[in-house]
Amino acid sequence: MATVIHSPRDPNTLSNYNNWVSTHITATFDILFEQKKLVGNVVHKLKSITDARSTEIILDTNHVDIGDVKVDGQASHWELLPPLEPYGAALKINLDQGVGLNEMVEVEISVKTTEKCTALQWLTPAQTSNRKHPYMFSQCQAIHARSIFPCQDTPDVKSTIDFNITSPLPVVASGLPVRGIIEKAQPGSKTLYQFHQKLPIPSYLFALASGDISEAAIGPRSVVATSPDKLSECQWELKADTENFIHAIEKIVYPYAWGEYNVLILPPSFPYGGMENPIFTFATPSIISKDRENVDVIAHELAHSWSGNLVTNASWEHFWLNEGWTTYLERRVSLHGEAYRHFSAIIGWKSLADSVEHFGHDHPFTKLVTDLKGKDPDDAFSSIPYEKGFNFLFHLENLLAKDKFDRFIPHYFTKFKGKSLDSYEFKATMLEFFQHDLEASNLLKNVDWDAWFYAPGLPPKPQFDTSLVDVVYELSSKWKSLPDSSFQPRTSDIEGLTANQIVVLLEQILLFERPLTPELSRVLGEVYSLAKSENIEVSNLYFQVGLRAGDDTVYKPTAELLGKIGRMKFVRPLYRNLQKVNRPLAIETFEKNKDFYHPICRAMVEKDLFGKREE
């Protein structure tokens, strides 16, 4: 029987993963803080998926130094092909001959990272919370693993991984710590840390961090890891909810598969809210708000343990299968009740509307299924796959009724466990699952799948339960009536409101066609104590209200906040709004802090402030 070679369905990789699939990776690295480099080697076990028809292995790389390459222990001829931006330079490894279908070859590559590595951020002691030691962490999503080591940098390929990491400081990785071995002391007061990831994962979930890290329990199968000076407050913030979150999602899908669920609270320059690295979620310190109001980030990253990490989008064009499902599961965590789920969805709708407004209503990146051929997936990053994806699943749930949709959820996550899929397989699976239920089958056949997948702009807005926002809407309408009404703001206006309700209030005020006056903006901050809030979700929105109002008393605090946090959710809108009222301050603030930001964040802000400029 002839071997069928399928064309790869991921346009953002240069690898020939349609000929070879990496099944296991052994990554051995020495962390060199002084040189800001990882040095070591990576071994790929690759399975042939043709019958001796491929005599070359092509891997993704981007700005890595390659030493030698061995195939099955023998030195091999290799070359770096000309760079194809933004994807890097493909590494072509020649084989003497092809190998049979399903036979294995072992490729060992010695490698060093360079200063152009986009996956690693190196922090000076001054950039950490206790200012004592340097720190390093990785962020490989979407296509940055290739800047650490040559790999098939696509979510359509999954490998088990062994990590052997030597560092002078504690290490965490996206594998289970190999316990029962004594961490081995190395020359120069370094220690070897070993981790094993027994479940196959895509390259974007390869993760490392090293620094002054301590751990404390937050549940029977969970620890929080962070800087020692922040450990107790992080433990308090997370210990009340983490195990409850795990139980809640297990009831909806099936038991947690990864053994431990741990959370690493990173230094403040981490660019995302969280990154769902298996075993160790990497999370921003902005969730530590001292009121347990922002732990939904943990619910979201935990939900990725099923959607994304076990069942994965086959390419970044179908990113909603990761993020839409995860947002859906996060909101199904019923610790707060159904009204809160709708409340969270209303906040999400506002975020979706903002993203559509930012790109433009007919922009291709506002589609659920995007075309990323020749594009950098980071450029398409926004709330759209999260919130448009959530709203599609929420629409299907309401269409079918929750009890029927709930029967589909574990079926879907079982069928694709350990696999990657695209939107068309999702659709086919749903239609097939309900084919013997005439009512459900007819309802699904009448869904305008093409409009959901390919229409740009906002989807149809669902009927949300507005009970938790009605009180906020009422208060925002009073603010809207100023200065023409007799409304006098008082502290009692917000008594009993959660921080997330304050977020909605501020978002409503940002929607006013006529911004607040500078004087009213100051009253808002003073009477409701918003300017001093330790909850960045609140303070960043208050600053945006002030910037829109032209209230110059928030300009300096905005610039100060931009020097303390690197989460793009806050950084990008604050820069966009600051530059509208004081562009010199925005540019000065960016130039002062650009080395503090993660390379991904820095590149995005540069585009926001300057358009595409050369390095």
Curated annotation (Swiss-Prot):
Catalytic activity: an epoxide + H2O = an ethanediol
Binding locations of Zn(2+): H300, H304, E323
GO cellular-component term (any): fungal-type vacuole lumen
Record-annotated active site: E301 (proton acceptor), Y386 (proton donor)
Protein keywords: Cytoplasm, Hydrolase, Metal-binding, Metalloprotease, Nucleus, Protease, Zinc
GO MF assignments: aminopeptidase activity; epoxide hydrolase activity; metallopeptidase activity; zinc ion binding
UniProt cofactor(s): Zn(2+)
EC primary class: hydrolase
SMART domains (UniProt xref): Leuk-A4-hydro_C
Organism: Aspergillus oryzae (strain ATCC 42149 / RIB 40) (Yellow koji mold)
InterPro entries: Aminopeptidase_N-like_N, Aminopeptidase_N-like_N_sf, ARM-type_fold, LTA4H, LTA4H_cat, M1_LTA-4_hydro/amino_C_sf, M1_LTA4H, Peptidase_M1
Compartment annotation: Cytoplasm; Nucleus
Keyword Ubl conjugation appears in the UniProt entry: no
Metal-binding as UniProt keyword: yes
Similarity field: Belongs to the peptidase M1 family.
Role of this protein: Aminopeptidase that preferentially cleaves di- and tripeptides. Also has low epoxide hydrolase activity (in vitro). Can hydrolyze the epoxide leukotriene LTA(4) but it forms preferentially 5,6-dihydroxy-7,9,11,14-eicosatetraenoic acid rather than the cytokine leukotriene B(4) as the product compared to the homologous mammalian enzyme (in vitro).
Chief location of this protein within or outside the cell: cytoplasm
Protein's GO biological process: cytoplasm to vacuole targeting by the NVT pathway; lipid metabolic process; peptide catabolic process; protein catabolic process; proteolysis
Residues the record lists as binding a peptide: Q139, C140, Q141, P271, Y272, G273, G274, M275, E276
UniProt EC number: 3.4.11.-, 3.3.2.10
Protein name: Leucine aminopeptidase 2
Pfam families in alphabetical order: Leuk-A4-hydro_C (PF09127), Peptidase_M1 (PF01433), Peptidase_M1_N (PF17900)
